[in-house]
Amino acid sequence: MNNQPVILAIDQGTTSTRAILFSATLEILAVQQKELKLHYPHKGWVEQNPEAIWQDTLEVCHAVLEHNVSMVGSVAAIGITNQRETTILWDRKTGKPVYPAIVWQDRRTDIGCEQLKAQGYEPMVTARTGLLFDPYFSATKIAWILDNVEGVRSRAMRGELAFGTVDCYLLWHLTGGKVHATDVTNAARTLLFNIVEQKWDADLLTLFNIPETILPEVRDNAARFGMTDRILFGRGIPIGGMAGDQHAALIGQRCFRPGMVKSTYGTGCFALMNIGSDFKPSQHRLLTTPAYRLNGKMVYAIEGSIFIAGAAIQWLRDELEFFQEVAASDALALSVPDSNEVYFVPAFTGLGAPYWRPDVRGMISGLSRDTTRVHIVRAALEAQGYQTRDLMAAIEEDGGHHAEIIRVDGGLVANKFMCQFLADILNKPVEVPKITEATALGAAILAGLTVDLFADLEVTGCYWQRDKIYTPTITETERERLYAGWKAAVQSLLHASRN
């Protein structure tokens, strides 16, 4: 094993940073993880410390290599996958950030997005980026920093500052400040990148008043991004793959054929369908986004984004103290026959697709004298299925394919109740892979492609293995009754917000 090549995957997520060593046959050899704090300085604001993101990344990489010293010299390449949209601006000379990272969940630019929408710009933006006006994406976050942090706009105009999503920021530091680049999937989440022409869009830069001088170069997902600074790991290691977390998961789940769907359940939930090489704007207020680009050839996906998934279960643990470990939610949900007509709409940071209502907030409905904490826990897990169903019909219609099966991954898929309910409410089989670290796995595959460990994406398909399959068990009548209750709860929330 010592002489066999290995791949180091960096998975920088919203709430943790992981370093995972993969073998050349894509088996997990070692994992190190560190939790990452979120900060909430004002209502609707969500920030992180960029320097903590970098230091945590370095720490977990060192830890995984120090615990596997015999493999250090065998690391053939590094792949990076990351929380998307989170926005960082830093000084090109010092690498120091000029402001905390504004996280993808942050809603401070709500009003600006609504103003641009009211001015009629959204159809043009959607036609070029595949996205909608929402604080979720990077452009209004960049503009906010430029306009609200003293001296930043003038420094940006002088070329002193660099912008990047987390992948780009990590690449900059890993290469000792030598490389300012991103990949097509992360660039596509900024509202500034034209995914049809595959370049930064001058009209969009003007619309958001963002200077092109701060933007990184955009590359394929499998590319020679640069070499790590020798001081970090004792030698230079090629960085060969980068992709936003959901795109990396699509690759990790081997969704290489049009019509294949993966759904990731982490902090949020993100369902993507591979739609092939043709750009198709969504007709249902979903997102069209690059799945990946290799050798200059783009493959697109339709995406439905749900802002709160596993975060709702963490909230029940941390804020309401319903249980001590997230894993306990599974047994609690199974201890009662149903949720006793309770519906939990986890709109903590607004509703994502297909509603796109950043202004609404969460709701628990159907409470009665005999409601217990167990019913609320079960309702929170059921919400993951309901939210996914909200997406799937629209994804299938937009994508032009019927999904026969859904491959799921992320931390929440360890919850057997959630996976079974997902199969029941979607009326589709749900597959869980043996390796649920699909995001890191996708980054490893991309890095391996670059250094010729794999001839192409397809050959990695033979390494995908199913761990479990969940099939529907409830009647159509029960399925539709449950879903009608969910729709009524959401409409009640939307109506209350309008009033």
Curated annotation (Swiss-Prot):
One of the GO BP terms on file: glycerol-3-phosphate metabolic process
Superkingdom assignment: Bacteria
Sites where the protein binds sn-glycerol 3-phosphate: T14, R84, E85, Y136, D245
Catalysed conversion reaction: glycerol + ATP = sn-glycerol 3-phosphate + ADP + H(+)
Gene Ontology molecular-function annotations: ATP binding; glycerol kinase activity
Residues that coordinate or bind ATP: T14, T15, S16, T267, G310, Q314, G411
One Pfam family this sequence matches: FGGY_N
Main EC class the enzyme belongs to: transferase
Chain positions recorded as ADP binding sites: T14, R18, T267, G310, G411, N415
Pathway(s) the chain acts in: Polyol metabolism; glycerol degradation via glycerol kinase pathway; sn-glycerol 3-phosphate from glycerol: step 1/1
Cellular component GO terms held in the UniProt record: cytosol
Key words, A-Z: ATP-binding, Glycerol metabolism, Kinase, Nucleotide-binding, Transferase
Listed SUPFAM superfamilies: Actin-like ATPase domain
Role played: Key enzyme in the regulation of glycerol uptake and metabolism. Catalyzes the phosphorylation of glycerol to yield sn-glycerol 3-phosphate.
NCBIfam families on file: glycerol_kin (TIGR01311), PRK00047.1 (NF000756)
Family per similarity comment: Belongs to the FGGY kinase family.
UniProt name for this protein: Glycerol kinase
